[in-house]
Amino acid sequence: LNERLSLQFHHGREMFSLQLKDFIKHMEQMMYELQHSDSSVKSLIAQHQDGQPRFEYAYHAYTKTKLKGSKSGDSYKIFSLTNQLVAILLSDGMGHSLKSNQESERIVTYMKQFMKYSIQPETAMHTLHYLYAFQNHDDMYATLDVGMIDLQEGKYYCWKAGCMSTYIVRKNEIFKLNSFSPPIGAMPQFYVEMGTHELKSNDMIFIVSDG
């Protein structure tokens, strides 16, 4: 019995050591990426105070399940951070089950709370990735598409992790914002893709998932 307990203790200590090393590596990588990120969006939320915006917006959300009676793995939230900033969150959990829906809903809920406390999207997404990766569940991951519309300057900012491309339609033109980054919690190496696009009156933004 003592030998078995000793082996279990040794195994637990080794696992803790590996997790601690992973945590340190993750934090170092996150700090490096934040230091080298685009300075024009690092303090975006903090820079915008309440005021009368120059532009107005309207939105429509459409969802459809793959099979009749199945549960969508997608979750989304659209909300105002200030009078000048509108946030859009879309997450796609793995599969078409209640669990996948719960995971994506948890992701967008946490992300909204981070942003409400003026935590920058890239920092929040790295934190969410660490939390999911640290749980060590191979089948637990979700995409995350974060968008912010600046109603004062007429700009669209996006941060993407494993999600589909975003399309901006302007009359006969279509602008595509691609994404090639991994989902949150899926792989040890994680990074966030960021983009900015100038907007004009009557532009339409399509933020989609693959279902």
PLM segments and residue spans:
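Catalytic core of PPM/PP2C metal-dependent serine/threonine phosphatase domains
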Residues: 36, 43-49, 53, 101-171
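Short, solvent-exposed secondary-structure boundary motifs
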Residues: 64-70, 134-138, 185-189
